Design a protein with these regions (language model features):
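Surface-exposed ligand/attachment interfaces on beta-rich extracellular proteins
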Residues: 2-24
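Short stretches within intrinsically disordered, low-complexity N-terminal or propeptide regions
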Residues: 16-19, 51, 78
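Exposed beta-strand and adjacent loop surfaces of beta-rich binding modules
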Residues: 26-28, 74
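Short, structured beta-strand segments at or near domain termini in extracellular proteins/domains
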Residues: 70-81
Length: 81
């Protein structure tokens, strides 16, 4: 059975598909998360991340893509196109 992946935003309650090569990780996805700027204004930003299936937590990659950070609030996610 072939899985059909749509490029639509999903709620954080829906979990992305498991990565084929990594046992406890989902596929990398685009996340929509709230972020506060230097002036205290909260805005929605898009970041690349994944869901850890064993820890039941979202993680995002830092903006320079050198490290992973725990993400406590995810507004939505979608598969990378």
């Amino acid at each position: 059975m072939k899985m059909i992946i749509k490029n639509e935003w999903e709620t954080p309650d829906a979990i992305p598909a498991k990565d084929i090569d990594l046992e406890h990780f989902s596929e990398e996805v685009e996340l929509l998360i709230p972020e506060m700027d230097a002036f205290g204004v909260i805005r929605e930003v898009k970041r690349i991340g994944y869901y850890h299936l064993q820890a039941h937590q979202w993680f995002v990659f830092s903006e320079d893509n050198t490290r992973e950070e725990l993400c406590s609030r995810v507004l939505a996610w979608r598969y990378l196109s």
